[in-house]
Amino acid sequence: MNVTSISFPYGESIHWFSPQKIDSLPHSQLKEWLLATGSLTQRLKTHCKHFEVKVLGEHLLEPLADEFPAQTNPVWIREVLLCLDGTPWVFARTLIPQTILGSQTPNYQNADDKQIREQQNDFTRLGTRPLGELLFSSPDITPGNIEVAQFETCGRLAALATSLNQQVNSSLWGRRRYFNLHGSQLIVSEIFLPAAVEYINQSI
């Protein structure tokens, strides 16, 4: 796999839209995957024998233009590949504000303080653990609406797919979602790579 942290971050600036406002959503099985509200990690695991998270990079960085309008400070950016039986299926990019990381955490005055702080620290200690396991297992984290976007074949993510020996014949589709945690929000974007699209569209 010809990918290193040297090129991190891979994310590119793009406008995201509500699915109801896009007429060009793919008329295929991929559309259902884009709009599914459950954990993508759990769903991917049902389509392979071995699921793996490959970390491309993670660091405190400035978000891209218009990527996280509510944030004026650097955020924790984590980019990974979700791989099924050794094949990268999904590029995932997560943006976590410092209020969630704990560096600007308020002084909580209740019995849940220790639990909250431990949960915040988990985001920077994930390693190869899927973020979805944390997002969908905590009763304190509430998922928001799904937005979608179409990535051009000449963009950075298409170049990433090409470096993974996946031919990009058409634009890539992705989705993103805000997750709410104790008054703060983090963003998770998931872009389906060509290998995933080929498999999904061939499935019944």
UniProtKB/Swiss-Prot annotation:
Q: Which GO terms describe its biological process?
A: pyruvate biosynthetic process; ubiquinone biosynthetic process
What is this protein for, i.e. what is its function?
A: Removes the pyruvyl group from chorismate, with concomitant aromatization of the ring, to provide 4-hydroxybenzoate (4HB) for the ubiquinone pathway.
Q: Does the keyword Cytoplasm apply?
A: yes
Alphabetical UniProt keywords: Cytoplasm, Lyase, Pyruvate, Ubiquinone biosynthesis
Q: What reaction gets catalysed by this protein? A: chorismate = 4-hydroxybenzoate + pyruvate
Residues annotated to bind substrate? 78, 131, 190
Any GO CC annotation of this UniProt entry:
cytosol
The UniProt entry lists the main location of this chain as cytoplasm
Q: Which InterPro entries match?
A: Chorismate--pyruvate_lyase (IPR007440), Chorismate_lyase_/UTRA_dom_sf (IPR028978)
Query: PANTHER family in the record, alphabetically?
Result: CHORISMATE PYRUVATE-LYASE
Q: What organism is recorded for this protein? A: Shewanella frigidimarina (strain NCIMB 400)
Its annotated compartments are: Cytoplasm
How is this protein named in the record? Answer: Probable chorismate pyruvate-lyase
Source organism, top-level taxon: Bacteria
